[in-house]
Amino acid sequence: IRLSLVGSEMCIRDRPSTLSIDLAELLVDTIHSAEWAIFAKNGSDAVSLAMMTARSATGRDKIIMYNGSYHGTHTWMRNAGDPGIAAADVANTIYIDWNNLQQLEDAIAAHEGDIAALIATPYMQYTFADNVLPAPGYWNDVRSICTAHGIVLILDDIRTGWRLDLAGSDHYFGFEADLICCGGALANGWNISALCGKDSLKNACSSVSYTGTYWHSAAPIAAAIATLTKLREHEDACGYMRMIGESLTSGLESISAQHGFHMVTTGEPCFFSIRLADDDNFVLHQEFIAECVKRGALFAPHHNHFTNLAETMEDVDQTLIIANEAFSAVASQHPDMGFTA
């Protein structure tokens, strides 16, 4: 990374590098469904390119996405009625409920021959609500339906990539996506994202005019190579992150119960969400978060938490000590609610 930065200072930081070839080959070798890769700067870029690729490949306009999902900041990826979003921005978006195959089939029947793609995260990662895993067999059914109707299946793996399975979250859930959007952990915080796909869509992707400022900077590409190499060299990177998450979530559930609370944890252990039951206005949850922050542990108020290879069991133990103190403090603030300080 340092060499990439120094070299870039001799000219401009945003310049092509042979490292991009190395990273593309590494991604193809790592992700089960990937046969090519192209790079951008953030998740929205990768998702937007995936949509354009699907439309170019199929000659169709409409996209299916799930209610409550999030796929970036570009207007055509948002939800109807969101502030700043015009009706025309989402005129070609069809919204269905997660885990509802009948709604998917009905949407396709209502727009037969007009649907370019279906886009989804590996499982639903709601804000202010529990995560929801795919029902047994759901992804295989979705894959079969998309194939039967010539619909491109796009997996938004921006946040879950390399956490569930180094080979891709579609591999983890037992299906193959046509296009996979990567980012998040790709370069361990450096600004780079990627779109990977099947050979059948390579020409369609190549036909799309798509670029951006700083997209070809060598340093983030070098960081991505270093990150993926580190993950691949680990004996079981995803297994380790799962173990850390399981220890943390089971500990939180147990400690909360000791104080009379009910901590609900959902999602996969390496990428989980928490909330307190019987707390519809999130007051107790916010108080718990605040007490943890005071003591040095930061939890996301209403969204997912990530585990990583840098975390140790000592970190988990310290976090649970803080959580215990935080629950005690919240219980003390509500003596009439039956909690145990």
Q: How should these model regions be labeled?
A:
Residues I1-I12:
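Short, small-residue-biased leader/transition segments that mark boundaries at the very start
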Residues T227-E253:
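Structural signature of PLP-dependent enzymes
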Residues D22-A120, M124, G137, E246-T249:
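PLP-dependent aspartate aminotransferase-fold enzymes
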Residues M243-A290, A310-E311:
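Conserved PLP-binding catalytic core of the aspartate aminotransferase-like
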Residues R232-E233, E291-A341:
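PLP-dependent enzyme catalytic core of the Aspartate aminotransferase-like
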Residues P16-I21, N188-N191, L195, V208-R232, ...:
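PLP-dependent aminotransferase class I/II
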Residues N131-L164:
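Catalytic PLP-binding core of fold-type I/II PLP enzymes
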Residues I12, F173-A204, H216-A223:
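Active-site PLP attachment segment
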